[in-house]
Amino acid sequence: MIGLLFVFSVLLSFSVGYIFPFSTSNGPTVNDTLQHAIRSQRDVSKPIPIDRVEFSGVSLSSFFESEGYSSDSLSNLYGLLKENIAGVMIDLYWNEFTSKWQLCPAPFPNNITYTSSNRVVDVSWNNRTYKCDPNLSTDDIMSILNNFIRDTNTDVEANFMHVMYNLKSIHYKKSNQTINLENAYKEKNSNFNVGMDTLNDTVSLLSSYIFTPLLLEQYQSSSSKNANSSSSIRYIDSLNETQAIQKFYNQSTILMPSLQTTLLTQYKRLMVHVISNDMAESSRSYQISFSDKETIFFNNVFPAMIGHTNNASADDFCYELTHAYNGTDVNIMEFNRVSLNSTLRLIIDNDKTPFTTDSLSKYVRCGYCPVFNSTQYSSQKVTEGNSSIISQEFTSNLFWSWAPGQPSGPDNCTNCTRPVTNYTSKYSEASNGGSDEEEHSNNIAYKCVALTENGWEVSNCYEKYLFACQNKLSRNEWKLDNYTKRNYFDLDDDDCPEGYFFSLPRSNIEMLSLMTTVKQENVSYPIWIDLNDITVENCFVSGGPYAQCPYQETVTTDKFVRMIAPSFVVAMVVLVLIFLEKVFRKTPIQTNRKRYWKKAIQEYYAKNDYEGVPS
């Protein structure tokens, strides 16, 4: 029995330990370094508006074109979402014959036949033949997104996503000669129902998670009232960092809520955009409804700026921004113009000019959100232990923040001790006459983040580097003192000029403006930024060495049930065994011992029948 209880306690301890890892995801595994990079870049971006939060996307058309328009082509989507893909671009076709939205680029003849074992059929339109499943709809895509959102719906893992529609038409010119065409493609069988009636219907499965134009309007109205009721004059010194960020980005062309507000206060996980509308002009064309406008962002509300890798416009934009400086200063106005211009800035590749590691890094750093559209990315299945081509080739290039392989300490580090609780400030060091200098030189604590020419890297907090000071009211204006170096523990806002504070970039444009300042002032890397994981390993926070990790150990209900189930089963088995022991088990040794002594005493008294007290 004791052995069973010991086994139970071991299993229970293992299960409870498993309930609260820092990452609690299901599905294809993602290496720890990538998870930490994804989460930390998201956390850094929390105070900035959601339209400035960089993401990477994938075009589903590339999967459909290479594998056919069926649900099997979506098998990689969940795995890609786990690998830091947060955008899904979809070509959506308005079928003028049936007045439905569908994913297949060709109409289905009304006499089409298919079997449950082979649902994919060949359909032709405009001199092209497609393999399409009539049952395929946007619900197949949205159900995968819904599962991913549910599986990651914790403060630790939740990210903000984008669904992007390209609207197209299955169009024909109506005439006497097209009567037979209409008869062939008009929907006649009510049991054969292909597509959705409205745009709003295509995303109805995700309705509770969508940040809508209606919510944006409510936020803007509320923000306007708060601004009018508060004082119009605020001293710069009284602003904390969050207020300073809000004050700067409130000058944007479109006032948007922060990622923190949207993701962790309103609990919204995605936006839906129509990024292009190429529907043919026709009396049978789809008419955008009021309900659509309340749910989906169109270009007149939130515009999209789309670049293509085979077009020089995106490269020209990046070149101008990365060279926005001269011998005397950085062109802050140009960086601010880009930062405050509210657009969905996309760069899309293709088979002729796919992304390279260098081009992808360039586009991400200068403010573009890449969308992988080349068919080469769909050639490999994404399973547990088998990552996608995108992840294998471009993981390090999807981040505007971290350098390749980061966040991580140095390779083969055998003495990476972390004496971070007992450090000496610059003030106590001065009072000791600099006696702590030698002690600091022997300390190692790879817990602080420095900017290098390749991006952020985890560095030894006791090293003395230059440090980044950011203007409180102008997010792209930085000061770097080439004559002053500090270790991370000695840094505070007093080391920066008036109106500046020790800070870090929170967007790709802020990052680029800092790196441009480094070039303009001709200073050397590395440079300290306000980011560390001192209090909790791999929980990167800003606010100095005393900043606390904001996360409690949380887990979704579904995951908690799945993880506690083994312990519950073991506990029930042990309870049943205890019950069976109490009911059915007897101890023969104890029972015989009782009977034997009772009989022996009775026989003794029968032979020795004393009366009175023996002498």
From Swiss-Prot:
Cytoplasmic compartment spans: 581-615
Cellular compartments annotated: Membrane
Stretches that traverse the bilayer: 560-580
Keyword Signal: yes
Top-level lineage group: Eukaryota
Spans within the Extracellular topological domain: 18-559
Main subcellular location of this protein, as a coarse class: membrane
Pfam families hit by this protein: TIM-barrel_MTC6
GO cellular component: membrane
Membrane topology classification: Single-pass type I membrane protein
Record keywords: Glycoprotein, Membrane, Signal, Transmembrane, Transmembrane helix
InterPro entries named among the record's database cross-references: Telomere_Capping_Maintenance
Glycosylation positions in this chain: 31, 111, 127, 135, 176, 200, 228, 240, 250, 311, 326, 341, 373, 386, 412, 415, 422, 482, 522
Signal peptide location: 1-17
Protein task: May be involved in telomere capping.
Family (UniProt): Belongs to the MTC6 family.
The protein's name: Maintenance of telomere capping protein 6
